[in-house]
């Protein structure tokens, strides 16, 4: 659930809704928030200006945890980053943010930090979006060979992106694989559907990511190459 806090700035109070769970935020929101955080850590390593100014660069390699571990920010840099995060979350301008009490900024940042906790999958197999129910492609996986799946979904590319933390690629993958019961595959509809799915909340994105990983591991174990390697290991 989201919570509402009251901010005071120049004797003016404003209620602001703060997301505290993955289901409270969309892929687009998380991408923009991630970009702000990465920008500050990247600037600490003096990366080139062009890369720092990219938008919606969602946790691209190097991973966020690597940036944080290898490039700790000093107190001044942390304050600047927190101010930018606060401004984005609350919708206040930087000028308005500078007038907000530090304790309130700290309160908001501490709430957002809950989103860094590891997501625990619930085993979702479908989701509702804009009044429609979409299903994860369980039947597709049951009927497909690993080779067919690789070819039809460009899985190798998506797995590489997912390993680098780039969950912004998943709306397109979901647009291809997740369908309503009465929906047929339509390649021409994928771009619009992908853009629409950028409005999905991150809990659904996480669930699909886990689903995709589990199904992929299962198909890998059924592939001829994997079985041959297993036999070779047993013969050693």
Name each model-derived stretch.
Residues 1-236:
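Charged interaction scaffolds used for protein-protein
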């Amino acid at each position: 659930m989201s919570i509402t806090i009251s901010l005071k700035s120049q004797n003016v109070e404003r209620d602001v809704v703060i997301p505290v769970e993955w289901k409270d935020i969309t892929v687009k929101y998380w991408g923009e928030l991630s970009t702000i955080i990465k920008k500050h850590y990247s600037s600490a390593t003096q990366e080139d200006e062009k890369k720092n100014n990219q938008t919606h660069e969602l946790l691209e390699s190097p991973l966020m945890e690597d940036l944080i571990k290898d490039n700790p920010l000093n107190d001044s840099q942390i304050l600047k980053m927190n101010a930018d995060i606060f401004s984005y979350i609350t919708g206040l301008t930087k000028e308005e943010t500078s007038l907000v009490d530090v304790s309130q900024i700290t309160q908001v940042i501490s709430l957002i930090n809950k989103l860094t906790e590891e997501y625990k999958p619930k085993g979702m197999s479908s989701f509702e979006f804009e009044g429609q129910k979409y299903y994860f492609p369980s039947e597709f996986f049951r009927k497909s060979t690993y080779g067919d799946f690789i070819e039809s979904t460009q899985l190798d590319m998506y797995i590489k992106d997912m390993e680098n933390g780039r969950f912004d690629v998943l709306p397109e993958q979901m647009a291809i694989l997740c369908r309503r019961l009465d929906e047929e595959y339509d390649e021409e509809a994928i771009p619009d559907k992908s853009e629409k799915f950028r409005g999905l909340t991150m809990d659904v994105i996480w669930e699909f990511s886990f689903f995709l990983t589990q199904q992929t591991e299962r198909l890998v174990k059924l592939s001829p190459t994997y079985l041959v390697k297993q036999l070779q290991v047993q013969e050693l």
